[in-house]
């Protein structure tokens, strides 16, 4: 029976079990690879019965994490750690929920006392996958300070922009980026506190490791209203500077229960590994809120760079039951010989970030016996659509709407389109705004207003819904190619390209043409075995393959072989960069 979370249940800690445990605890059966959901019976009942009351006050640290500590002490949860960290040097950290609570309260006292931060002050966090990153997340929750994550790939210019535009009061980083911060700090009038995660001291910085040794673990969590701003995520658009996307204590702290309970299908017995970079909102999705609201263990491997063999070895060595990664990672993994790896505990694999092509899911299934359950969402949302356990997977589809949202395909006037017709993917926000949606773009009311059309929030993505209610991604609205009157989405062309044995990966954009206005151009990364082939002949073979695989008018009239595709830190292909280069605008 699907649990219903009511306002009364959320107001009282003693009722927390019904919020977080959502179904029975399951034991780990190493040979059990069933796709039967643990937390719901089927998609239809999940969608129909789901309710989530939003209390006036909510704080994830107090109302979720501390409640798991109480259950842990009472012996009412499995012995999995709350947090499990490893690195390539063989070092390992395991924290129970009680230890996570104690350490995060110490960190909270450092923020409040040593850094003199007040509720609502903003904290930029730029760290790789180190344990302190998770402590900082929880410490900000406890103090009511607003967390602003950033990737360690940020340049000095990027850091300056983020510090100035966010008006951040504190920054937390490491030895690598501290010099860049020091170089721009005089230009950031709101910045008054700097914490460094390092074995060494640095002038003008508080050394977190040393301060943690002396900090008290006695701290009272602030009482935050559900609609207070909890975090701000910088998200890049197709033009201009990155936007600041604001989320509240309820939009992510409660909203991501949808991800954890339904899409990830987590229980307290699970060990969840998400490979996302710490600077991406996907880490909040699958490395913090979704697993911990379900009482699951957050597992992470501090890999400085992507290494397919390290990922395969880790999945084989450790009792990871749920694995989440970007399509690019899965594509690179299946190119390896996986016969020697046995994933004895792995039961559930999910992917997000951009569409995953059917050829990758088929290869993964053939090599592991497991399906990949694709999910679709944005920095601005929790899970919008997904493939859920217990429902048929249509290869290439992003599944059906999550319980959080009423999703439709709409036209330019905000009218709902029938099945089969392409339009803009929208989420209904009137008359009642759903709980798992961002509040606004900070200091950018015009951009916030531009996302609304009629009764809908417009995602900026194009797609269609089929007769069975499955949603299909076509392209970002700005990625659609208009050629000789045809509208061509890059994903379908890329899907066809990637099925050719010579293609490791591809990206499709528009290219100027004097007759057709624009045509399809494919940037192709070749598999190693094909790099010595005659390129002109190979281009013809690839073009003919696409003509036979999809509608002939979609084939790439131009093909360019490149060494690698430009990617964002989350693994998404930067089609916009390729398109601008093609049109000579950069």
Swiss-Prot record:
GO terms for biological process: acyl-CoA metabolic process; fatty acid biosynthetic process. Keywords: Acetylation, ATP-binding, Fatty acid metabolism, Ligase, Lipid metabolism, Magnesium, Metal-binding, Mitochondrion, Nucleotide-binding, Transit peptide. One of its GO terms (molecular function) is 2-methylbutanoate-CoA ligase activity. Signal peptide: none annotated. Pfam families: AMP-binding, AMP-binding_C. It catalyses: a medium-chain fatty acid + ATP + CoA = a medium-chain fatty acyl-CoA + AMP + diphosphate; propanoate + ATP + CoA = propanoyl-CoA + AMP + diphosphate; butanoate + ATP + CoA = butanoyl-CoA + AMP + diphosphate; 2-methylpropanoate + ATP + CoA = 2-methylpropanoyl-CoA + AMP + diphosphate. It is an enzyme of class 6 (ligase). GO terms for cellular component: mitochondrial matrix; mitochondrion. InterPro entries: AMP-bd_C, AMP-bd_C_sf, AMP-binding_CS, AMP-dep_synth/lig_dom, ANL_N_sf, Mitochondrial_ACSM. It is found in: Mitochondrion; Mitochondrion matrix. Its EC number is 6.2.1.2, 6.2.1.17. The modification N6-acetyllysine is found at residue 157. The keyword Protein transport does not apply. The modification N6-succinyllysine is found at residues 73, 106. Belongs to the ATP-dependent AMP-binding enzyme family. Catalyzes the activation of fatty acids by CoA to produce an acyl-CoA, the first step in fatty acid metabolism. Capable of activating medium-chain fatty acids with a preference for isobutyrate among fatty acids with 2-6 carbon atoms. This is Acyl-coenzyme A synthetase ACSM3, mitochondrial. The lineage of its organism: Eukaryota, Metazoa, Chordata, Craniata, Vertebrata. The gene is ACSM3.
